[in-house]
Amino acid sequence: MQRRIMGIETEFGVTCTFHGHRRLSPDEVARYLFRRVVSWGRSSNVFLRNGARLYLDVGSHPEYATAECDSLHQLVTHDRAGERVLEELLIDAEQRLAEEGIGGDIYLFKNNTDSAGNSYGCHENFLVVRAGEFSRISDVLLPFLVTRQLICGAGKVLQTPKAATFCLSQRAEHIWEGVSSATTRSRPIINTRDEPHADAEKYRRLHVIVGDSNMSETTTMLKVGTAALVLEMIEAGVAFRDFALDNPIRAIREVSHDLTGRRPVRLAGGRQASALDIQREYYARAVEHLRNRDRDPQIDQVVDLWGRALDAVEAQDFAKVDTEIDWVIKRKLFQRYQDRYDMELSDPKIAQLDLAYHDIKRGRGVFDLLQRKGLAKRITEDEAVDAAVDTPPQTTRAKLRGDFITAAQEAGRDFTVDWVHLKLNDQAQRTVLCKDPFRSVDERVDRLIASM
């Protein structure tokens, strides 16, 4: 499948600093954030005009699920638009707090852990054909996903009893299973719960929950693009070396703690391989596969960065990727800060800087400041991101959903939507079932909109 439906779900961390004596719980802060949403959507679980889903998840974490996208740049643009949507809610909530005499600054963090050790996720979704052998997908993907943090981790300072140490991944310490149908209880690498949000006879939805939330657009592109490419190769029958891991959960932590990528991890049967070895194998297969594939400039970008990132890790010389890979950008920032102020990695100010890196508010968040200075590369344009706040992808089912929502809201009609259903809640209870996520034109939806 060269054209694939993809999406990203991101849970955001929330905190608030108060200017006066009154304090609010995280639940109350979250309710302030979503008050504007509830006022028009009558719920804290809504679909937006751009086709995305916005809701309040378990533990007072706002969650944004992008609409269905069929290209990497489109997906990164809509992922970034999600940050803008949440930023608007943040600004609105701060104004409400001020009007009610509760002065405070609200912070939304696109990260994966809080100071109490809780974890929240960034989930990638990929449409795969039902006819394929799902167990083979899991078997081949698992070693890839365990070692992918070498090129896609968001970076984290981990406080251990001995000392503070810089790790590749925020999520690695919180994964407890390889493949499972649960998402919160056991936190697997791949979630197997079968909810395709499409024609179940044709498709499955692969739900990857191991990845970090990335601030870097190029890292997001690399994270999703490499996974999509490996999926494409599996579907095409490409043969891979057997890197079945003896213990994926131990391996994912070992990889996260080794910035050189050279520490051997134990494979099934007593063999060993390093994260660099494993990633090199998948990269080599990808380069070979692309020789016989139609050219795609976006995939070319992914493979180019993949190769350069592996070269940088191998040489331990990150100059050629230090504006493109999240954990490298963050580590360089910390090193400059430590050198300037003569401080240890365990200093609380580094922990504050780590958090501020993930602050999504423009003009305040550290990553945004780095981006403005040209220290973090972009692949999106502001105009495209602004448009994506209100406009769905034009090449997928998301267009049908977004157009329907816009028309119903403008006509003042009561409606219900989910990923596959569009329904007018009038006497006729008219519903259109959209089972093909690739389809952006549908006469039934046109008629439903015209009937308003």
UniProtKB/Swiss-Prot annotation:
Taxonomic superkingdom? Bacteria
Q: Name one Pfam family in it.
A: Pup_ligase
UniProtKB keywords: ATP-binding, Ligase, Magnesium, Metal-binding, Nucleotide-binding, Ubl conjugation pathway
Q: Which family does it belong to?
A: Belongs to the Pup ligase/Pup deamidase family. Pup-conjugating enzyme subfamily.
Protein name per Swiss-Prot or TrEMBL? Pup--protein ligase
Return the EC number: 6.3.1.19
Instruction: Quote the catalytic residue positions.
Output: D57 (proton acceptor)
One GO term (biological process):
proteasomal protein catabolic process
Catalytic activity of the protein: ATP + [prokaryotic ubiquitin-like protein]-L-glutamate + [protein]-L-lysine = ADP + phosphate + N(6)-([prokaryotic ubiquitin-like protein]-gamma-L-glutamyl)-[protein]-L-lysine
Enumerate the residues binding Mg(2+): E9, Y55, E63
Could you cite one Gene Ontology molecular function of this protein? ubiquitin-like protein transferase activity
Q: Where does ATP bind?
A: R53, T66, W419
The organism named in the record is: Nocardia farcinica (strain IFM 10152)
Pathway(s) of this molecule: Protein degradation; proteasomal Pup-dependent pathway; Protein modification; protein pupylation
Q: What else is known?
A: The reaction mechanism probably proceeds via the activation of Pup by phosphorylation of its C-terminal glutamate, which is then subject to nucleophilic attack by the substrate lysine, resulting in an isopeptide bond and the release of phosphate as a good leaving group.
Functional description taken from the UniProt entry: Catalyzes the covalent attachment of the prokaryotic ubiquitin-like protein modifier Pup to the proteasomal substrate proteins, thereby targeting them for proteasomal degradation. This tagging system is termed pupylation. The ligation reaction involves the side-chain carboxylate of the C-terminal glutamate of Pup and the side-chain amino group of a substrate lysine.
